[in-house]
C-alpha cells in the first residue's frame, strides 16, 4: 500500500511532499559542498591539494542548489501542493505525468553525482563553457554525464510546466477569473512560460557540446569554423531567464505571506504585481549578454545590454515598494514567516543594488569573474530564494502537516541563519572590489581576513541548517495542532475543512462567490 502510494502516486499533495523531501536532501548535499569550498578558502594555502577537485565541488554545488534544491522545492513542492488548492481544482491536470516529472529528478541527481565520481569530474563551473568542457581539456565521461543529468532535469521541468500551464488555464473553479488568481499561482504561471522558452535553448546548447565532444562536430571549435562564444550566447539565453525562474515563485510566496500577516484581504497593488512579474519574465530574455561583457562585444551592443538590464530594476522595484506599502501602517503580527519575508525585502533589495552596479558594462569589465559577482548572486539567491523557501515553508507548514512549528525556536533559527548568510556573503563584496577572482582554490595573503570571516559565517549557516532539521522533528514529535488563521484570507487554500486537506480535496466542485461591498 505505502509502495503504491508513494512510488506510483497521482496525488498532487503526495507528489508535492516528495518534491519537498527530495529538495531538502539535495539542499543538504549542496550545503555540504559549499562547506568544502569555504573550508578550502578559510586560510591561504591548500586543503584539497587539487584544483580540479575544487572546481568539481564548485560546479556540483551550483548545479545541485539550482536544479535539485530551489527548483524542486519552489515549483515542484509548493507549486504542486498549493496551486490546486488555491484555484479550487481537485488535482493537477495530468496526475501521472506529474509523477513522472518527479521521478526523473532522482536519476538526474545520481547522474550529476556520478559525473563527479568518474574520471576527473566535471570541473567546468556550472556554465560548462567550451573549450574547457571539450574532449581535450575534459577527457573522459564526466562532462557527458553532467550533460545527460541536465537533459533529464530539463525533461522533468518541461513535463511539470506543461502540467502547471494546463492546470492554471483549464482547472480554475467557476468564478475565479485570471484577474482574481492568487499571486503565487500567477508567479508559477509566468515561471512555467520562462521554462518553456528557455529550457529548449539549453538542451540545444548542451546537445551541440555533446556532439562536439563525441562525434567530431565543431559547433564550438574554431578549428572547424565553430565559435565558443556561440555556446556562451546559447547558455546565457537559458541562464538568465533561469535566475528569474528561481526567484519568481519566491516573489509570489512572499506576496501571500505579507498580505496574510498584515491582516489584509489582498496584496497592495495586485494588478501591478502581476504585470511586474510578466514584465520581469519578458525582459529576462532580452538581457542575456550582460553575463558576457568581457568577450569583446562592440560598444553599441554593450550600451543596449547595460540599459536593458537596468530597466529590469523598474518592475522589481515596483514589487519591493508594493510590499513595503502593504506593510506600512498595518497591524503586523511578528510571526516567523513575516520575519523571513522582511529579511527578503531588505536583503534581496541589497543584492539587487549590486546587480545595478554590475549592469554597467564598464564597471563589469573590472568586476567580472570576481567575488563581487559571487556576493551579488548569493544575496539574491541565498537570501532571496532560500529565505522565500523558509518563509513559505513556515507559513504553509500547518496546512501541509496539520502541526505547527515551535514559534520561539523558529525565530532563533531565523536569527542564526540571518547572521550566518550575511557574515558569509557581505565580506565577499570587499574581496571582489579588491580584485579576488572567482573559482580559484587559493589566494594571496592580502585577502585572508575577509575570507576567514566569510568561512566563519558559512559555519554558522550550517548550524542553522541542523537546527532547522531539529525544528521539523520537534514539530512532528510534539504534535501541536496547526493554528488556523484567525481571519479568512483572500486565498482559497485555508478554506478547507481539515489540516491537512483530505487526500482527495473535494467531494463536489467548489465555486467562488465574490461579495461586492
Curated annotation (Swiss-Prot):
Keyword Transmembrane applies: yes
Ligand binding (Ca(2+)): 40, 45
Reactions it catalyzes: 4 Fe(II)-[cytochrome c] + O2 + 8 H(+)(in) = 4 Fe(III)-[cytochrome c] + 2 H2O + 4 H(+)(out)
Cofactor: binding comment: Binds 2 heme A groups non-covalently per subunit.
Cofactor(s) required, per the database record: heme; Cu cation
Any one annotated GO CC term: respiratory chain complex IV
GO biological process: aerobic respiration; oxidative phosphorylation; respiratory electron transport chain
Binding site for Mg(2+): 368-369
A GO molecular-function descriptor: metal ion binding
Transmembrane segments annotated in the record for this chain: 17-37, 63-83, 102-122, 145-165, 183-203, 234-254, 268-288, 305-325, 338-358, 380-400, 414-434, 456-476
Location of the protein in the cell: Mitochondrion inner membrane
Positions with a binding annotation for heme a3: 376
Recorded metabolic or biological pathway in which this protein acts: Energy metabolism; oxidative phosphorylation
Membrane-related topology note: Multi-pass membrane protein
Residues reported to bind Fe(II)-heme a: 61, 378
UniProt family annotation: Belongs to the heme-copper respiratory oxidase family.
Subunit text: Component of the cytochrome c oxidase (complex IV, CIV), a multisubunit enzyme composed of a catalytic core of 3 subunits and several supernumerary subunits. The complex exists as a monomer or a dimer and forms supercomplexes (SCs) in the inner mitochondrial membrane with ubiquinol-cytochrome c oxidoreductase (cytochrome b-c1 complex, complex III, CIII).
Protein name in UniProt: Cytochrome c oxidase subunit 1
Lineage of source species: Eukaryota, Metazoa, Echinodermata, Eleutherozoa, Echinozoa
